[in-house]
UniProtKB/Swiss-Prot annotation:
<dbReference type="InterPro" id="IPR020003">
    <property type="entry name" value="ATPase_a/bsu_AS"/>
</dbReference>
<dbReference type="InterPro" id="IPR000194">
    <property type="entry name" value="ATPase_F1/V1/A1_a/bsu_nucl-bd"/>
</dbReference>
<dbReference type="InterPro" id="IPR004100">
    <property type="entry name" value="ATPase_F1/V1/A1_a/bsu_N"/>
</dbReference>
<dbReference type="GO" id="GO:0016887">
    <property type="term" value="F:ATP hydrolysis activity"/>
</dbReference>
<keyword id="KW-1003">Cell membrane</keyword>
<dbReference type="GO" id="GO:0005886">
    <property type="term" value="C:plasma membrane"/>
</dbReference>
<dbReference type="GO" id="GO:0046933">
    <property type="term" value="F:proton-transporting ATP synthase activity, rotational mechanism"/>
</dbReference>
<keyword id="KW-0997">Cell inner membrane</keyword>
<comment type="similarity">
    <text>Belongs to the ATPase alpha/beta chains family.</text>
</comment>
<keyword id="KW-0375">Hydrogen ion transport</keyword>
<keyword id="KW-0139">CF(1)</keyword>
<comment type="function">
    <text>Produces ATP from ADP in the presence of a proton gradient across the membrane. The catalytic sites are hosted primarily by the beta subunits.</text>
</comment>
<dbReference type="InterPro" id="IPR005722">
    <property type="entry name" value="ATP_synth_F1_bsu"/>
</dbReference>
<keyword id="KW-0406">Ion transport</keyword>
<comment type="subunit">
    <text>F-type ATPases have 2 components, CF(1) - the catalytic core - and CF(0) - the membrane proton channel. CF(1) has five subunits: alpha(3), beta(3), gamma(1), delta(1), epsilon(1). CF(0) has three main subunits: a(1), b(2) and c(9-12). The alpha and beta chains form an alternating ring which encloses part of the gamma chain. CF(1) is attached to CF(0) by a central stalk formed by the gamma and epsilon chains, while a peripheral stalk is formed by the delta and b chains.</text>
</comment>
<keyword id="KW-0067">ATP-binding</keyword>
<dbReference type="InterPro" id="IPR027417">
    <property type="entry name" value="P-loop_NTPase"/>
</dbReference>
């Protein structure tokens, strides 16, 4: 097929119309989702993606970067296929953008065998399911909404309730404990958080730039000439970013770019070797939001609450690719921003149906000073089942939920009549529920710089033992404050004894 060259006919914000002259049977128009390249006057290449065919010889495209400086009549070159992402050992420890270019200032990436970002989900006969729990070391999650290996997990919450901190703690705990590989897609979030995440990962050794670079970083420098590329390939994570300042085309596609990298690692295992990949997305709502912006720019009629009419289709197409096959598993953790704390908004509501476990963060719990601010009654998990987690774990989890639910029902009576009007049995329920509620908190390693308290990871046996002791009344004599921001029940008992001694003085 002969190469055809188009020309820009119209630019409206991030939407670029491209006109192809003399298009006949031999010279085909670029297909939907094909990438086209525009050479800017400064020599840099702008990638645009075909979204619509309008008229006979014109395609409407959405830009993956700023369209500043484009003019009508500039030449546009089809690439002959969709946007692709580089693959292999070379991308370990690297930062990439939506089109797979490195954005960390280091050497450029080789495109040999690159994967297209628009791929079909695996065939039905290739899928597998694993009924195995992925323990995180976070008490409230492991006890009440355990995560499934190879499952999809959603962290729901409004603005500023701790979704990103929880995702960073999960990366810290799981990536260190589970020696597999992680992929992080930053979708429409703050650039500062991406910068913090990179520094945090270099410090913790999840990304390895080498000792010489680490020493220069600790002195306040950022000298990329000191990066050891042999060490870099031992890194356990790749980062793909399309942040808040990017145009909507980039934010809508960067989740697919990150997913493509995760799929490439899942499928790269040798025969008989299973790869377990962790895929973090922060934030899946921004993917929907960017899709809504693109939809409006392309002139589609909006649907409920102003979202795109194709919301469920776009979400389904992406979520169906996040799955486990015979070659390996992808366990995904997705932060979901909840606009105005309304879980019935179409964006979070559409995401719900794809998930195996949901962790709901609640502003009312942050107001009590309990972190992570997980709502234990609103959060759910498909695998909280005695056949999977064991009878003892299941029984303790159900008892915790029952006592918290009963406490919630009694709050109305307390607010009107006061604690004195409760029966002795109900007073006991409220006192134990308040201890349980506080024991669901714990200090995080990633928040240590703010709190000054070292983070802890708590094993599932210690978690079950601690909650069982509270429910059985073995620690009723300790003050409530002893259970706040501690790891194991032993720490709570020690803290409680100190508080009692101080009270006597």
């Amino acid at each position: 097929m002969s190469q055809i060259i188009g020309h820009i006919s119209q630019v409206i914000g991030p939407v670029v119309d491209v006109y192809f002259e003399g298009t006949d049977a031999e010279l085909m128009l670029p297909s939907i989702h094909d990438a086209l390249e525009i050479k800017r006057p400064n020599g840099k290449i702008l990638v645009v993606e075909v979204q619509q065919h309008i008229g006979e010889n014109t395609v409407r495209t959405v830009a993956m970067d700023s369209t500043d400086g484009l003019q009508r009549g500039m030449k546009v070159y089809p690439t002959g296929g969709p946007i692709t992402m580089p693959i292999g050992e070379q991308i370990k420890g690297r930062l990439m953008n939506v089109v797979g270019d490195s954005i960390d200032g280091m050497k450029s990436l080789d495109r040999t065998g690159a994967y297209s970002i628009h791929r079909d989900p695996p065939k039905f006969e290739d899928l597998t399911t694993v009924q195995e729990v992925l323990f995180t070391g976070i008490k409230v999650i492991d006890l009440l909404e355990p995560y499934a290996k190879g499952g999809k997990i959603g962290l729901f919450g409004g603005a500023g309730v701790g979704k990103t901190v929880l995702i960073q703690e999960l990366i810290n705990n799981i990536a260190k404990k589970h020696n597999g590989f992680s992929v992080f897609a930053g979708v429409g979030e703050r650039t500062r958080e991406g910068n913090d995440l990179l520094r945090e990962m270099i410090e913790s050794g999840v990304i390895r730039y080498g000792e010489a670079f680490k020493e220069s970083m600790e002195k306040g420098d950022w000298d990329l000439s000191k990066v050891d590329y042999n060490e870099l390939e031992k890194s356990q994570v790749s980062l793909i970013f399309g942040q808040m300042n990017e145009p909507p085309g980039a934010r809508a596609s960067v989740a697919l770019s990150g997913l493509t990298v995760a799929e490439s690692f899942r499928d790269a295992g040798k025969e008989g070797e299973k790869r377990d990949i962790l895929f973090f997305i922060d934030n899946i709502f921004r993917f929907t939001q960017a899709g809504s912006e693109v939809s409006a720019l392309l002139g589609r009629m909006p649907s409920a609450v102003g979202y795109q009419p194709t919301l469920a289709t776009e979400m389904g197409a992406m979520q169906e690719r996040i799955t486990s096959t015979r070659k390996g598993s992808i366990t995904s953790v997705q932060a979901v921003y909840v606009p105005a704390d309304d879980l019935t908004d179409p964006a979070p509501a559409t995401t719900f149906s794809h998930l195996d476990a949901t962790t709901v963060l609640d502003r009312k719990i942050t107001e009590l000073g309990i972190y992570p601010a997980v709502d234990p009654l609103a959060s759910t998990s498909r695998i909280l089942d005695p056949h999977i987690v064991g009878q003892e774990h299941y029984d303790v989890a159900q008892r915790v939920k029952q006592i918290l639910q009963r406490n919630k029902e009694l709050q109305d009576i307390i607010s009107i009549l006061g604690m004195e009007e409760l029966s002795e049995e109900d007073k006991l329920v409220v006192n134990r529920a308040r201890r349980v509620q506080r024991f669901l908190s714990q200090p995080f390693a990633v928040a240590e710089q703010f709190t000054g308290v070292p983070g802890v990871m708590v094993g599932i046996e210690d978690t079950i033992k601690g909650f069982r002791m509270i429910l059985d009344g073995e620690v009723d004599n300790l003050p409530e404050q002893a259970f706040l921001n501690v790891g194991t029940i032993e720490e709570a008992i020690e803290k409680g004894k100190k508080l009692l001694e101080q009270a006597k003085k």
